[in-house]
Amino acid sequence: MSLLDYFKSSKKPATAVTAKERLQIIVAHQRGERDAPDYFPQMKQEIIEVIKKYVHIDPEQVSVQLDKNDNKLSVLELNVTLPEKS
């Protein structure tokens, strides 16, 4: 083992791994939106408005995704980060 091998790290920095995971999520999200029906953006906005009637949320904390599989089955996935109870 040389002195240079000692300073080289075989592990990727945690920030690089986190950035890679985030990029994969963004790419998957954009692919999902590309295949979404024309009414999807309006439906997403209306869902956010309904949630805002009951809970104060940041629209950026709402994720709506439409997934399709080979059996022509569509799944609407909704993830909302709700505020903590005060």
Curated annotation (Swiss-Prot):
Pfam families: MinE. InterPro entries: MinE, MinE_sf. Keywords: Cell cycle, Cell division. One of its GO terms (biological process) is regulation of division septum assembly. It comes from the Bacteria. Prevents the cell division inhibition by proteins MinC and MinD at internal division sites while permitting inhibition at polar sites. This ensures cell division at the proper site by restricting the formation of a division septum at the midpoint of the long axis of the cell. HAMAP family: MinE. Belongs to the MinE family. This is Cell division topological specificity factor. It comes from Shewanella woodyi (strain ATCC 51908 / MS32). The gene is minE.
